[in-house]
Amino acid sequence: MDSIKIALQYMLPKHFLSRLVGKFAAAEAGAITTAVIKWFIKQYKIDMSEAQQPEPEAYKTFNAFFTRALKPELRPICQESNMMAHPVDGAVSQCGPIEAGNIFQAKGHSYTSEALLGGNKTDAARFDGGDFATIYLAPKDYHRLHMPITGTLSKMTYVPGDLFSVNPLTAQNVPGLFARNERVVAIFETEVGPLAMVLVGATIVASIETIWSGTVTPPGGKQVFSWDYPTTGPEAVTLEKGAEMGRFKLGSTVVMLFAQDAIETFADGVEPGETTRMGQPFARLKQQ
Protein backbone atom coordinates (compact mmCIF):
# COMPACT_ATOMS: atom_id res chain seq x y z
CA MET A 1 0.00 0.00 0.00
CA ASP A 2 2.81 2.43 0.84
CA SER A 3 4.43 1.84 -2.56
CA ILE A 4 1.11 2.61 -4.26
CA LYS A 5 0.80 5.89 -2.34
CA ILE A 6 4.30 6.93 -3.42
CA ALA A 7 3.70 5.90 -7.04
CA LEU A 8 0.51 7.98 -7.14
CA GLN A 9 2.45 11.04 -6.01
CA TYR A 10 4.76 10.72 -9.01
CA MET A 11 1.73 10.43 -11.31
CA LEU A 12 -0.59 13.13 -9.94
CA PRO A 13 -0.66 16.64 -11.49
CA LYS A 14 0.55 18.13 -8.21
CA HIS A 15 0.93 21.75 -9.34
CA PHE A 16 -2.52 21.78 -10.93
CA LEU A 17 -4.12 20.30 -7.80
CA SER A 18 -2.32 22.81 -5.58
CA ARG A 19 -3.48 25.76 -7.70
CA LEU A 20 -7.04 24.44 -7.66
CA VAL A 21 -7.09 24.00 -3.90
CA GLY A 22 -5.42 27.39 -3.51
CA LYS A 23 -8.23 29.13 -5.37
CA PHE A 24 -10.84 27.56 -3.12
CA ALA A 25 -8.82 28.24 0.04
CA ALA A 26 -8.71 31.95 -0.85
CA ALA A 27 -12.39 32.18 -1.83
CA GLU A 28 -15.05 33.72 0.40
CA ALA A 29 -17.62 30.97 -0.12
CA GLY A 30 -19.85 31.63 2.88
CA ALA A 31 -21.62 28.53 4.18
CA ILE A 32 -19.47 26.25 2.02
CA THR A 33 -16.27 27.63 3.55
CA THR A 34 -17.70 27.24 7.06
CA ALA A 35 -18.77 23.65 6.36
CA VAL A 36 -15.31 22.73 5.08
CA ILE A 37 -13.66 24.35 8.11
CA LYS A 38 -15.93 22.42 10.49
CA TRP A 39 -15.16 19.17 8.66
CA PHE A 40 -11.42 19.91 8.83
CA ILE A 41 -11.60 20.63 12.56
CA LYS A 42 -13.38 17.33 13.19
CA GLN A 43 -11.23 15.30 10.79
CA TYR A 44 -7.92 16.45 12.28
CA LYS A 45 -9.10 16.91 15.89
CA ILE A 46 -8.04 20.57 16.04
CA ASP A 47 -8.30 22.23 19.45
CA MET A 48 -9.99 25.52 18.58
CA SER A 49 -9.91 26.63 22.22
CA GLU A 50 -6.28 27.62 21.53
CA ALA A 51 -7.28 30.00 18.72
CA GLN A 52 -7.76 33.72 19.31
CA GLN A 53 -10.97 33.31 17.32
CA PRO A 54 -12.43 29.87 18.16
CA GLU A 55 -15.65 30.14 16.10
CA PRO A 56 -15.45 28.56 12.60
CA GLU A 57 -18.02 31.03 11.27
CA ALA A 58 -15.64 33.93 11.98
CA TYR A 59 -13.25 32.92 9.18
CA LYS A 60 -14.18 34.28 5.76
CA THR A 61 -11.75 32.00 3.91
CA PHE A 62 -10.15 28.64 4.55
CA ASN A 63 -6.74 30.33 4.40
CA ALA A 64 -7.74 32.67 7.22
CA PHE A 65 -8.71 29.65 9.32
CA PHE A 66 -5.61 27.66 8.43
CA THR A 67 -3.25 30.50 9.35
CA ARG A 68 -5.26 31.38 12.47
CA ALA A 69 -3.56 33.14 15.36
CA LEU A 70 -3.26 31.44 18.74
CA LYS A 71 -3.80 33.01 22.13
CA PRO A 72 -0.31 34.40 22.84
CA GLU A 73 -0.27 33.24 26.45
CA LEU A 74 -0.41 29.62 25.22
CA ARG A 75 2.96 29.86 23.44
CA PRO A 76 5.30 31.85 25.72
CA ILE A 77 8.78 32.39 24.27
CA CYS A 78 11.65 30.94 26.31
CA GLN A 79 13.52 33.85 27.85
CA GLU A 80 16.99 32.35 28.37
CA SER A 81 19.41 34.50 26.37
CA ASN A 82 21.57 31.50 25.46
CA MET A 83 18.66 29.37 24.23
CA MET A 84 16.93 29.34 20.84
CA ALA A 85 13.16 28.89 20.75
CA HIS A 86 11.16 26.38 18.74
CA PRO A 87 9.97 28.19 15.59
CA VAL A 88 6.80 26.15 14.98
CA ASP A 89 4.29 23.66 16.27
CA GLY A 90 5.06 20.34 14.60
CA ALA A 91 7.14 17.21 14.89
CA VAL A 92 10.90 16.84 14.51
CA SER A 93 11.65 14.88 11.36
CA GLN A 94 15.44 14.89 11.69
CA CYS A 95 18.17 16.97 13.32
CA GLY A 96 21.92 16.76 13.63
CA PRO A 97 25.22 17.81 12.05
CA ILE A 98 25.72 18.87 8.44
CA GLU A 99 28.43 16.41 7.38
CA ALA A 100 30.52 17.21 4.30
CA GLY A 101 27.68 19.39 3.08
CA ASN A 102 25.12 16.59 3.44
CA ILE A 103 21.83 16.71 5.36
CA PHE A 104 20.20 13.50 6.58
CA GLN A 105 16.61 13.02 5.37
CA ALA A 106 15.70 9.44 6.32
CA LYS A 107 17.32 6.01 6.30
CA GLY A 108 19.13 5.68 2.99
CA HIS A 109 18.40 9.25 1.89
CA SER A 110 20.28 12.53 2.21
CA TYR A 111 20.67 15.71 0.19
CA THR A 112 23.16 18.56 0.04
CA SER A 113 22.84 21.97 1.63
CA GLU A 114 23.84 23.42 -1.76
CA ALA A 115 20.85 21.76 -3.46
CA LEU A 116 18.52 22.82 -0.64
CA LEU A 117 19.60 26.45 -0.97
CA GLY A 118 18.95 26.54 -4.71
CA GLY A 119 22.38 25.54 -5.98
CA ASN A 120 24.27 28.46 -4.44
CA LYS A 121 27.71 27.21 -3.36
CA THR A 122 28.58 30.43 -1.54
CA ASP A 123 25.45 30.31 0.62
CA ALA A 124 25.93 26.60 1.32
CA ALA A 125 29.56 27.09 2.39
CA ARG A 126 28.40 29.35 5.23
CA PHE A 127 26.83 26.29 6.88
CA ASP A 128 29.68 23.80 6.40
CA GLY A 129 30.24 21.91 9.64
CA GLY A 130 27.07 23.33 11.15
CA ASP A 131 23.80 21.76 12.21
CA PHE A 132 20.31 21.32 10.79
CA ALA A 133 16.80 20.60 12.01
CA THR A 134 13.79 19.55 9.95
CA ILE A 135 10.30 20.01 11.42
CA TYR A 136 7.10 18.71 9.81
CA LEU A 137 3.85 20.63 10.25
CA ALA A 138 0.81 18.33 10.11
CA PRO A 139 -2.60 19.62 8.95
CA LYS A 140 -3.75 19.98 12.59
CA ASP A 141 -0.83 22.21 13.56
CA TYR A 142 -0.56 25.98 13.98
CA HIS A 143 0.88 27.19 10.67
CA ARG A 144 2.69 30.41 11.45
CA LEU A 145 6.48 30.31 11.64
CA HIS A 146 8.49 32.27 14.19
CA MET A 147 12.13 33.22 14.68
CA PRO A 148 14.19 30.87 16.87
CA ILE A 149 16.65 33.70 17.52
CA THR A 150 16.83 37.41 16.73
CA GLY A 151 18.07 37.91 13.17
CA THR A 152 18.35 40.42 10.34
CA LEU A 153 17.26 39.29 6.89
CA SER A 154 20.06 39.37 4.29
CA LYS A 155 18.68 37.28 1.43
CA MET A 156 15.56 35.50 0.19
CA THR A 157 15.55 32.90 -2.59
CA TYR A 158 12.61 31.27 -4.35
CA VAL A 159 13.43 27.82 -5.74
CA PRO A 160 10.85 26.22 -8.09
CA GLY A 161 10.36 22.48 -7.89
CA ASP A 162 8.03 19.55 -7.34
CA LEU A 163 5.19 19.45 -4.85
CA PHE A 164 5.44 16.01 -3.29
CA SER A 165 3.79 15.46 0.07
CA VAL A 166 6.29 15.97 2.90
CA ASN A 167 4.79 13.55 5.41
CA PRO A 168 7.05 10.95 7.06
CA LEU A 169 6.15 8.22 4.54
CA THR A 170 7.22 10.38 1.60
CA ALA A 171 10.39 11.54 3.38
CA GLN A 172 11.37 7.89 3.77
CA ASN A 173 10.79 7.04 0.10
CA VAL A 174 11.43 10.05 -2.17
CA PRO A 175 15.16 10.82 -2.58
CA GLY A 176 16.21 14.41 -1.90
CA LEU A 177 12.62 15.37 -1.10
CA PHE A 178 13.26 18.73 0.56
CA ALA A 179 15.80 19.75 -2.10
CA ARG A 180 13.44 18.95 -4.98
CA ASN A 181 10.18 20.49 -3.73
CA GLU A 182 9.31 24.14 -4.30
CA ARG A 183 10.67 26.25 -1.46
CA VAL A 184 11.52 29.70 -0.12
CA VAL A 185 14.91 30.22 1.54
CA ALA A 186 15.37 33.11 4.00
CA ILE A 187 18.88 33.76 5.32
CA PHE A 188 19.27 35.83 8.48
CA GLU A 189 22.36 37.24 10.18
CA THR A 190 22.35 36.46 13.91
CA GLU A 191 24.67 36.76 16.91
CA VAL A 192 25.90 33.20 16.21
CA GLY A 193 26.31 33.52 12.45
CA PRO A 194 23.95 32.88 9.54
CA LEU A 195 20.62 31.12 9.96
CA ALA A 196 18.73 29.65 7.00
CA MET A 197 14.98 29.15 7.33
CA VAL A 198 13.82 27.02 4.39
CA LEU A 199 10.05 26.87 3.95
CA VAL A 200 9.31 23.79 1.84
CA GLY A 201 6.14 23.55 -0.22
CA ALA A 202 4.13 20.36 -0.68
CA THR A 203 1.11 18.89 -2.43
CA ILE A 204 -1.86 21.23 -1.93
CA VAL A 205 0.29 23.88 -0.22
CA ALA A 206 -1.33 26.79 -2.00
CA SER A 207 1.37 29.33 -1.19
CA ILE A 208 4.11 30.45 1.17
CA GLU A 209 4.01 33.89 2.76
CA THR A 210 6.68 35.94 4.54
CA ILE A 211 6.19 38.95 6.81
CA TRP A 212 8.39 41.24 4.69
CA SER A 213 7.21 40.29 1.18
CA GLY A 214 3.72 38.84 1.55
CA THR A 215 2.86 35.84 -0.63
CA VAL A 216 5.91 34.74 -2.61
CA THR A 217 4.67 34.40 -6.20
CA PRO A 218 7.51 34.65 -8.76
CA PRO A 219 6.73 34.08 -12.46
CA GLY A 220 6.27 30.48 -13.52
CA GLY A 221 9.11 28.40 -14.92
CA LYS A 222 12.24 26.77 -13.59
CA GLN A 223 14.31 29.86 -12.79
CA VAL A 224 15.62 30.50 -9.28
CA PHE A 225 14.94 34.05 -8.04
CA SER A 226 16.93 35.80 -5.29
CA TRP A 227 16.53 39.10 -3.47
CA ASP A 228 19.20 40.77 -1.31
CA TYR A 229 18.22 42.92 1.68
CA PRO A 230 20.14 45.64 3.55
CA THR A 231 21.26 44.53 7.01
CA THR A 232 21.66 48.07 8.33
CA GLY A 233 19.69 51.29 8.07
CA PRO A 234 15.96 52.04 8.11
CA GLU A 235 15.09 49.40 5.50
CA ALA A 236 16.72 46.50 7.35
CA VAL A 237 14.32 43.70 8.33
CA THR A 238 15.21 42.63 11.88
CA LEU A 239 12.95 40.14 13.65
CA GLU A 240 13.21 39.40 17.37
CA LYS A 241 13.26 35.90 18.82
CA GLY A 242 9.69 34.61 18.76
CA ALA A 243 8.49 37.12 16.14
CA GLU A 244 6.41 35.76 13.27
CA MET A 245 8.41 35.41 10.03
CA GLY A 246 6.10 33.51 7.70
CA ARG A 247 3.06 31.32 7.11
CA PHE A 248 2.14 28.19 5.19
CA LYS A 249 -1.24 28.38 3.47
CA LEU A 250 -1.75 24.64 3.98
CA GLY A 251 0.91 22.71 5.80
CA SER A 252 4.44 21.64 5.05
CA THR A 253 7.97 21.53 6.48
CA VAL A 254 10.64 23.95 7.64
CA VAL A 255 14.34 23.08 7.42
CA MET A 256 16.76 25.20 9.47
CA LEU A 257 20.50 25.41 8.89
CA PHE A 258 22.90 26.78 11.51
CA ALA A 259 26.54 27.82 11.17
CA GLN A 260 29.42 25.86 12.63
CA ASP A 261 29.77 26.49 16.38
CA ALA A 262 26.34 28.14 16.63
CA ILE A 263 24.72 25.31 18.60
CA GLU A 264 26.20 23.67 21.65
CA THR A 265 23.42 21.10 21.95
CA PHE A 266 19.79 20.63 21.04
CA ALA A 267 17.37 20.91 23.97
CA ASP A 268 15.87 17.87 25.68
CA GLY A 269 13.16 16.33 23.52
CA VAL A 270 14.49 17.68 20.22
CA GLU A 271 14.85 14.37 18.43
CA PRO A 272 13.11 12.59 15.53
CA GLY A 273 9.43 11.92 16.13
CA GLU A 274 9.07 14.27 19.08
CA THR A 275 6.40 16.98 19.12
CA THR A 276 7.46 20.62 19.13
CA ARG A 277 5.63 23.65 20.48
CA MET A 278 6.51 27.13 19.28
CA GLY A 279 8.41 29.14 21.89
CA GLN A 280 9.73 26.22 23.94
CA PRO A 281 13.52 25.73 24.31
CA PHE A 282 15.01 24.42 21.06
CA ALA A 283 18.81 24.60 21.20
CA ARG A 284 21.50 25.98 23.49
CA LEU A 285 23.85 28.50 21.90
CA LYS A 286 27.57 27.84 22.02
CA GLN A 287 29.53 30.48 23.91
CA GLN A 288 31.09 32.81 21.36
UniProtKB/Swiss-Prot annotation:
The record marks G251, S252 as: Cleavage (non-hydrolytic). It is a peripheral membrane protein. Transmembrane segments: none annotated. It is found in: Cell membrane. GO terms for cellular component: plasma membrane. Is synthesized initially as an inactive proenzyme. Formation of the active enzyme involves a self-maturation process in which the active site pyruvoyl group is generated from an internal serine residue via an autocatalytic post-translational modification. Two non-identical subunits are generated from the proenzyme in this reaction, and the pyruvate is formed at the N-terminus of the alpha chain, which is derived from the carboxyl end of the proenzyme. It is an enzyme of class 4 (lyase). Keywords: Cell membrane, Decarboxylase, Lipid biosynthesis, Lipid metabolism, Lyase, Membrane, Phospholipid biosynthesis, Phospholipid metabolism, Pyruvate, Zymogen. PANTHER family: PHOSPHATIDYLSERINE DECARBOXYLASE, PHOSPHATIDYLSERINE DECARBOXYLASE PROENZYME, MITOCHONDRIAL. Heterodimer of a large membrane-associated beta subunit and a small pyruvoyl-containing alpha subunit. This is Phosphatidylserine decarboxylase proenzyme. The gene is psd.
